[in-house]
Amino acid sequence: GLKPDSEYRYETLIDGELVKSETALRVRTYPREGQASAFRMGLGGCAGYTPIYERMWSTVASHDLDAMLMLGDNVYLDLPEMAGAFHDYTYYRRQSNPDFRKLVASTPMYSIWDDHDAVIDDIWMGRYRDKPDWKQPMVNLFNRNWVNPGEGVTEWPGCWYSFSIGDVE
């Protein structure tokens, strides 16, 4: 396996073909669980798409973070009944940004949702798992676009989970 607190370089292959990258792709493993260690974590949220501000991702990446926690409103969908191409495009637009791609290629990303990731805060965990009709498709969309270590529990899909970096949980 990988050694703790070590940097590794990696390549991406699609159908056996090397995908070229503008920068060297790297990943740094966390310190051994329970081991005290300094680390850098970024916190972000309310990341609506405004083209002139999308350069912010390169500013965030310049801090060489060990992890980034996105605290919701990661994209602004706000129209849950229009699930489909509009929502896919909203994520595609963000994820195709070169500065964002560089950040996520080298920084572990953790995310939770808030109202703009769908709409109406209380609907996410309201009384009904599958109502309104758009609720489960929005949960599925979020999970397709964020590789989190957990998705709630079977009875109530969600975006809560825990993770550790060294001696911090």
Where do the model's predicted regions map?
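Metal-dependent phosphoester/phosphodiester hydrolase catalytic core
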Residues: 1-169
